[in-house]
Regions:
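Conserved short strand/loop->alpha-helix "switch" segment adjacent to the catalytic nucleotide/phosphoryl-transfer site
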Residues: 26-45
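A short glycine-centered beta->alpha linker in the GHKL/HATPase_c
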Residues: 81-86
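Short Gly/aromatic-enriched secondary-structure transition segments
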Residues: 88-89, 445
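Short adenine-binding "F-helix/F-box" segment of the Bergerat
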Residues: 87-88, 95
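GHKL-family ATPase ATP-binding module
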Residues: 1-14, 21, 45, 53-55, ...
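C-terminal interaction appendages of subunits in large macromolecular complexes
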Residues: 389-408, 423-428, 439, 443-445, ...
């Protein structure tokens, strides 16, 4: 995939310097996305990307990542080691140049790395600038070299601290707490990315270990990610909770017009498509030219096969591209020397030269498979025909959703208690479980900017429903209407149209019990599958009602978890007995009166809202399919590990 380079040829003079570091600390979000959870974890990805580049060049097969007890991070690889010799132009060690100058590194020298990862491509120097402390250790040329930095500034010249027979680079850093709003690393977020990298770069091993905690046996949580079959295994992982339509993962790897292309795809019995597209290991959430090439290759090849085999002869309906992608799970990975990223979040590939190579690769792979597997080919085409029929039914149902908006005067559902403010940026709507809790919420809200929409019972599980059934569902029609969301734009008849979106905060408020969690998940599944843009824009939130009211005499406190409850019990009992303290466990929102609901859950000054974000699209997709699909054991295991109510009400 990348040119082989002798270890000796990766030298100080391969390091190219493009610009200085000053701006990073002033405007960190420009370089790493944000200064919250996403940016914090992005620092780790930048360092790991350096090691992945070494792996792509054929010089590294083991990357180890530790979350240390103090929330610092250590990344170690067995690559060639960053060069330490004096840089000809800079007149200082190449290691210091790489660590202190933005965009300095071998990845900008095409002879050193043919392709390199990293969305922002800012390299490890950016991590250095945003770290309170960083230590770089290089094992190279029989010596151990080291340099330490504070907020990006070297504390001493690069020095030799010992001899070694090993080779590689180790970077330990602690993010600067004066810059980052979030400072605690989430093991699961890092694990999802390390797993993804192992699938995308087959043959390498990535080990993640959390030194902050131990299990019952006294061992630190640790995962080893390694994949011999790469994207084929990735597809199987994404689909592991879905029922297979065909037994195989169809796989292609090759180089067309100098662009390495790797594709894996399979079909399941669900009604959703799940295509994960990557460029240089970056998940391009907004798609781009490689995704267009994939879709074109898939549609044209399947259409031709279906027509040539006579399977479409009796069908009176037109088949379109979407029909070929219902139930499809695919991973597309391309390596591009100079990627051009576009779109809102800079995750849309713009290189036009990528479309044809991907399209050709998919066509060749799929044509061969269909010819060699006629039974599976027939199953796929039969599903396509069913999808086309369902799409025609869904179009009529979608038109009914639109008509409901237009025909019903204000276009708002009768159950919606709207707010008086008309600026969507200042308005919020609560989707509340049940009419009785909805009544309490209506009494407790601030009518100026808070709207209440009660939902009756459990909404439809969209993961298992055919698309026309979804748009015929009354509660789902009401959600579209209440939000002012329409379907169809000038460019795309099925795209989400947010021009008349009425609220910039959509808050899901359910009971604090197992049923409430289930309803919350059903609503989130709907948003993830049909209104993902609202999640990506940061508009979806989950309310956090208290679990307990702890009371003694005139004194009362709300508790949101068991630790808080126990703390208040100890404070209130004083020298008395615990039984002297009254504890009310709130199982439903209806158990609180309007004032209590306002004070704890709806008052912007006092409430806690959890914003719903998608850190890893591939991981989110498989979690939703697992939670809302048919397989019970993985769902039970996930809930026991993650749900705060699992042990209370089961």
């Amino acid at each position: 995939m990348s040119e082989e380079i002798d270890r000796s040829n990766y030298s100080a003079d391969n390091i190219q310097v493009l610009e200085g570091l000053e701006a990073v600390r002033k405007r960190p979000a420009m370089y790493i996305g944000d200064i919250g959870t996403k940016g914090l974890h992005h620092l780790v990805y930048e360092v790991v990307d350096n090691s992945i580049d070494e792996a792509l060049a054929g010089h590294c097969d083991l990357i180890s990542v530790w979350i240390n007890e103090d929330n610092s991070i250590t990344v170690r690889d067995n690559g060639r080691g960053i060069p330490t010799a004096i840089h000809t132009k800079e007149k200082r060690s190449a290691l210091e140049v790489v660590m202190t100058v933005l965009h300095a590194g071998g990845k900008f020298d095409k002879d050193t790395y043919k392709v390199s990862g990293g969305l922002h491509g800012v390299g490890v120097s950016c991590v250095n600038a945003l770290s309170g402390d960083l230590r770089a250790t290089v094992y190279r040329d029989g010596k151990i070299w080291q340099q330490e930095y504070k907020i990006g500034k070297p504390q001493y010249d690069v020095k030799v601290i010992g001899d070694t027979t090993e080779h590689g680079t180790e970077v330990q850093f602690k993010p600067d707490t004066t810059i980052f709003e979030a400072t605690v690393y989430n093991y699961d977020i890092l694990a999802a990315r390390m797993r993804e990298l192992a699938f995308l770069n087959k043959g390498i091993t990535v080990v993640l270990t959390d030194l902050r905690t131990t299990d019952d046996d006294g061992k630190n949580p640790s995962d080893t990610f390694h994949s011999e079959r790469g994207l084929s295994e990735f597809c199987e992982y994404l689909d592991r909770n879905r029922e297979k339509l065909i037994p195989d993962v169809i796989y292609f790897e090759g180089e067309n017009d100098g662009i390495p292309v790797e594709v894996a795809l399979t079909y399941n019995t669900s009604y959703t498509e799940n295509i994960q597209a990557y460029v240089n290991n970056i998940n391009t959430h907004e798609g781009g030219t490689h995704l267009s090439g994939f879709r074109r290759g898939l549609t044209n090849t399947l259409k031709k096969y279906a027509a040539d085999s006579g399977m479409l002869a009796k069908e009176k309906i037109e088949i379109d591209g979407d029909d070929f992608r219902e139930g499809l799970t695919a991973v597309v990975s391309v390596k591009v020397q100079e990627p051009q990223f576009e779109g809102q979040t800079k995750t849309k590939l713009g290189n036009r030269e990528v479309t044809a190579p991907v399209s050709q690769g998919v066509s060749t792979m799929l044509s061969n498979y269909l010819e060699e597997h006629p039974a599976e080919a027939k199953i796929i085409v039969d599903k396509v025909i069913l999808a086309a029929r369902a799409r025609h039914a869904a179009r009529k149902a979608r038109e009914m959703v639109q008509r409901k908006n237009v025909m019903s005067g204000s276009g708002l559902p009768g159950k919606l208690a709207d707010c008086s403010e008309k600026d969507p940026a200042l308005c919020e709507v609560y989707f509340v479980e049940g009419d009785s809790a909805g009544g309490t919420a209506k009494q407790g809200r601030d009518r100026h900017f808070q709207a209440i929409m009660p939902l009756r019972g459990k909404i439809l599980n969209v993961e298992k429903a055919m698309i026309h059934k979804i748009f015929e569902n009354e509660e789902i029609k009401n959600i579209y209407t209440a939000l002012g969301v329409r379907i169809g734009t000038e460019e795309d008849s099925k795209a989400l149209n947010l021009e008349k979106l009425r609220y910039h905060k959509v808050i899901i408020m359910c009971d604090a019990d197992v049923d409430g969690s289930h309803i919350e998940t059903l609503i989130l599944t709907f948003f993830f599958r049909f209104m993902k843009e609202l999640i990506e824009l940061g508009y979806i939130y989950i309310a956090t009602p208290p679990l307990y009211l702890v009371k003694k005499g005139q004194k009362s406190e709300y508790a949101w978890n068991d630790d808080q409850r126990d703390k208040y019990i100890q404070e209130m009992k004083g020298s008395g007995l615990e039984s002297s303290v009254g504890i009310q466990r709130y199982k439903g929102l209806g158990e609180m009166n309007a004032t209590q609901l306002w004070e704890t859950t709806m008052d912007p000054e006092a409430r806690t809202l959890r914003q719903v974000t998608i850190d890893n699209a591939a991981e989110a997709d498989q979690i939703f399919s697992m939670l809302m699909g048919d397989e019970v054991p993985p769902r039970r295991e996930f809930i026991e590990k993650n749900a705060k109510y699992a042990k209370i009400d089961v």
